Amino acid sequence: MLNSRELLLSKYVNTIKKDDNSFRLFHSIHGGLCEVDNEIYKVLNYLKKSRLLTDIYNEFSYIDNSEINDIVNEFFEKGFIIYNGQNEIESYREHEKRRINRIETGEQIKAIQLVVSNKCNYNCKYCFTNSIYSSKEREIYQKHDKNQIMTPENAINYIEKVIEKIIKANNKELSIQFFGGEPLTNWNTIERVLDHYKNEDRLKIDYSIVTNGALITPKISEYLKKYNVPVIMSFDSPNRSHRYTNDGSDSIKNTIKSLEILKENNNYIAFNSVLSRDTFDYFNNDIVDFAQNYNVSEIGILLDLNPSFYKDFNLDDIVNKVIDLYEYGLDNGIIVTGYWHITYQNIIMNKSIDRGYKTCSATGGQLSIEPMGVVFACKGSSGYFGNMNDLEGLLSCENYIKYASRSFINSNNCINCELIGHCSGLCLGAIEKKYGNIMYMDKGACDLYKLLIRRLIEREKNIFRYDIDESK
């Protein structure tokens, strides 16, 4: 087939020149990050105008035809080379339509954020519950007397309803994240859920818990270890804190005490660390050294949810801070990640269009279930879907379909963006609050993501490389 049709380099192929014989390429929709030598780059560049395969043979007569065939076939399979006249964005839109038509089946549910408690023992300066909400439903339910603590019976009931629905949609896995408030203010429910599903064989369940860590005890640590529950602790820096207990004292002593317990039991520990206007001045590599001391495996950098951060701070300064910490972590055996890094991982993949969601499960891939059964997109979102008492109605409601579609549909302003197939943009809660429209593209945040991803690509040391001599 390739012999008889005109071929063309996709307009969605992006090039970053490394040196005179190294070019890094990725596709805005399909990913497939790779490096090519100058000869392969010239072959691909020649296809910026439509050509027959015989045209390529003639233009590059010094390269064996079999090698050219290998090159063309390889990059055709990756989606980098297309047929002349092929409408890639139309194919992308058709893929979106097919997924929208399946949303009501529950297929899009990849995760449950189980808000077991809306109580918290801390009073953090920049907690999003104090600033990000923007819907009447959030105003009603956040402090509702019956929406503070989830009973074990309700938790299991909610999970059962989701499992029964998604296995009919042929989903094989479900992530359950215990969330709050502070989830450990309701340890009883967490313990009951873990025990109830210890022999679950209908699908694979992965757990995690997001906690400030202050209430961790040896028993809790052992239980979380027993059920392979990663402990994601909210922690920004060993030098200074904006996280305070309700009596106004700094939280660092509590953090250290909990980390010592978790280290003793060899729990998997990750930090959620916020890089924001509040933490910018003291956010540095010290957190990696601190993490090493307590066997913390991973640091997730959460970028500021407030869009003004990307206007008020120099983007190069933000990117440099992230890259410095990322590379320092690599050098010291600590994984440094974040939603920004998931975008990068998506670009490394081939044909990544088929995954469940792009970066954050909250952007179309999860149900955030509150204690009394009301459901939102995320604890950090005001997007309200309904109640677990009517899961079928919830999945067919206009708002759920709109949010679930957001996992694979971006703003129309993203059409020509190099990250369109890999990035979900700024946090939904921030977009809701600032713009009142989850399809809005915040330019400041987008400019930061593009700059950060390009820096990661430029500095990556382990990229698959194609050389003309190795294509025989």
Curated annotation (Swiss-Prot):
Where is the Radical SAM core domain positioned along the sequence?
A: 106-331
Annotated residues for binding of [4Fe-4S] cluster 2: 414, 417, 423, 446
EC number assigned by the record: 4.1.-.-
| Keyword 4Fe-4S among UniProt keywords | yes
Q: Which cofactor does it need?
A: [4Fe-4S] cluster
At which residues is there a site annotated May act as a redox switch? 339
Q: Which residues form the signal peptide?
A: none
Q: Which residues bind [4Fe-4S] cluster 3?
A: 339, 360, 378, 427
How, per the record, is the cofactor bound? Binds 2 auxiliary [4Fe-4S] clusters that are seen in the crystal. One cluster is coordinated by 4 cysteine residues, and the other one by 1 tyrosine and 3 cysteine residues. Most likely binds a third typical [4Fe-4S] cluster in the radical SAM core domain, but density for this cluster is absent in all forms of the TigE crystals.
Q: Where does [4Fe-4S] cluster 1 bind?
A: 120, 124, 127
Q: Which SUPFAM superfamilies match?
A: Radical SAM enzymes
> Which InterPro entries has this protein been placed in?
Aldolase_TIM (IPR013785), rSAM (IPR007197), Sulphatase_maturase_rSAM (IPR023867)
Q: What is the effect of changing residue 339 to A/F/C?
A: Loss of catalytic activity but no change in iron and sulfide content
Domain of life of the organism encoding this protein: Bacteria
Keywords noted in UniProt: 4Fe-4S, Iron, Iron-sulfur, Lyase, Metal-binding, S-adenosyl-L-methionine
The record describes the protein's role as:
Radical S-adenosylmethionine (SAM) enzyme that catalyzes the formation of methylcyclopropylglycine (mCPG) residues from isoleucine residues residing in the repeating TIGSVS motif of the precursor peptide TigB. Is thus involved in the maturation of a ribosomally synthesized and post-translationally modified peptide (RiPP).
**Protein name (Swiss-Prot/TrEMBL):** Radical SAM cyclopropyl synthase TigE
State the taxonomy lineage.
Answer: Bacteria, Bacillati, Bacillota, Clostridia, Peptostreptococcales
